[in-house]
Regions:
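Terminal amphipathic alpha-helical/low-complexity segments used for targeting or macromolecular assembly
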Residues: 1-68
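Structural signal for interior beta-strand "rungs" in well-ordered beta-sheet cores
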Residues: 70-187
Length: 190
């Protein structure tokens, strides 16, 4: 638990950056206080930052309990094992799912109903479900993922990319790509 206590100043700085990202990234935000007190995405990320520190401090049950409190309160399901960089903003948020081995970089923004999940679950020779392997996406810095997007498997969403609403992805995306739904997913660099 000493690790947890030692990490609190860092967690506080991360949370300050998350609140500022929400305020800066939402034209409807009228004040930092409004963001801090009224935005479910900020509440979910607050719980997550605490739960993640407990998770990496080898207190996984308490971490999962905190994550489930956040899920119940906000409709946002973030596994405490997920690694999330600073200035992270979930706008609206209902239905967001972020899996255990997801890695999210700095200055990432996602919208409601986004799933960062596993594509499949590996088994050993006896058919037993494998655990503790990387199976969720890596989202690099400065990425925006719009409502309803589903990104599955250990794929990389390159820095500066934009993933449009309702896009279904099971492949990696190069930096600065724009992936939109229009019959077929298209990839283009700006």
């Amino acid at each position: 638990m000493q690790n947890f206590a030692d990490a609190l100043p860092v967690i506080r700085r991360m949370l300050d950056s998350d609140v500022q990202a929400a305020y800066d990234g939402d034209p409807a935000a009228r004040s930092v206080d409004e963001v801090l007190l009224c935005y479910p995405g900020v509440l979910a990320v607050t719980y997550h930052r605490l739960a993640h520190q407990l998770y990496i401090s080898h207190v996984p049950l308490l971490a999962r309990m905190i994550a489930e409190l956040a899920h119940s309160a906000t409709g946002i399901d973030i596994h405490p094992g997920a690694q999330i960089g600073s200035r992270f903003f979930i706008d609206h948020g209902t239905g967001v799912v972020i899996g255990e081995t997801t890695i999210i970089g700095e200055r990432v923004r996602i919208y409601q109903a986004v799933t960062l999940g596993a594509k499949r679950f590996e088994t050993d020779e006896a058919g037993n479900l494998q655990k503790e392997y990387a199976r969720h996406p890596i989202v690099e810095d400065d990425v925006v993922i719009y409502a309803g997007a589903t990104i599955l498997g250990r794929v990389v969403i390159g820095k500066g990319s934009v993933i449009g609403g309702n896009v279904w992805l099971t492949r990696s995306v190069a930096p600065n790509s724009q992936i939109m739904q229009s019959g077929n997913n298209k990839s283009s660099a700006p």
